[in-house]
Amino acid sequence: MSYQYDRYLAQHKSNVEAGFRWLQKNLPEITEGSGAEHNIVFAHDQSKTEPDEYGPYDIYFYGGNRSYAVVEDFRKAWLLHIHRNPHHWQYWILINDDPEEGEIVLEMPYCYILEMICDWWSFSWFKGNLLEIFSWYEEHKNYI
């Protein structure tokens, strides 16, 4: 286990919670009755502690090695992560093998939308620029 990655995970979860607490305090109408609090405060990204995610993430971000094998292992771990965590928008895309159906975007429940926003916003909290989420979204919106 990596001290650096453990520290990152703790900080990330703390920042996700900080975003949610800010929303609760300043925009309570969007959090009340959402059912999002448990996932955001207690269970966010819990799967990142699973060995098949933890190891590849740790090596990719903190191992100082971006070999083909390391990158492939990370990509597999990322795929596992988004399929285990419904706060990722990719979780809600159904890729069919029937060409007439193609890709179908399913409706994402509101509680996971809140968690997704807090997840994105957590990086703004880390950087100390709470408005950074808007420029990030502007850069990525056409791919989401």
What are the residue ranges of the model-derived segments?
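Metal-dependent phosphohydrolase cores
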Residues: 1-144
